[in-house]
From Swiss-Prot:
GO terms for molecular function: magnesium ion binding; prenyltransferase activity. The gene is uppS. Keywords: Magnesium, Metal-binding, Transferase. This is Isoprenyl transferase. The keyword Transmembrane helix does not apply. Its EC number is 2.5.1.-. SUPFAM superfamilies: Undecaprenyl diphosphate synthase. It comes from Fusobacterium nucleatum subsp. nucleatum (strain ATCC 25586 / DSM 15643 / BCRC 10681 / CIP 101130 / JCM 8532 / KCTC 2640 / LMG 13131 / VPI 4355).
Amino acid sequence: MEKNIPKHIAIIMDGNGRWAKKRGLARSFGHMEGAKTLRKALEYLTEIGVKYLTVYAFSTENWNRPQDEVSTLMKLFLKYIKNERKNMMKNKIRFFVSGRKNNVPEKLQKEIEKLEEETKNNDKITLNIAFNYGSRAEIVDAVNRIIKDGKENITEEDFSKYLYNDFPDPDLVIRTSGEMRISNFLLWQIAYSELYITDVLWPDFDEKEIDKAIESYNQRERRFGGVKNV
């Protein structure tokens, strides 16, 4: 039977620190390995026909981590943007960042905006990176913009237009490392997404693990709150 490939996959990339700790390495090594895994995952998902990939890279709560780790993550993201620019243009990957811009280093924010502009017409796959992102913050920001615009009698469709992007809702949400929680990720958008949780740590999440997640997705019956006709 032919596989049904999700149009939009969202991933909570968890376990970088634990991956490094198991090997007696600093947490920063886990984050660097996680960046390599993201590149491989993006290539494979593009190959099999996924159109949107949203990844949870840095939450609004992650500012509470040790300062040296936060600094490492900022530098790593800047390096990732610079290193992947040519690859994204070559493979027609659109780059987009969802999240608040406050606190993000100015140099990093400029590089984000530059790559978003350069890749805005790429249409093979969209890589949406949730960075300095929290879903409650996104909802609050949307409400404040609605109030500012003086809107009344807002529908769900109207509300969605005030979120950080207009991408379709995720079909499948994957969380690595075995944690059984959403962690303030896409609370509005994943109302009817299928969830897949694996004990595999993010740096070890390879093509075979992606296939397992999609196989599990294909075994689900998506009813969106309804019932199957008998």
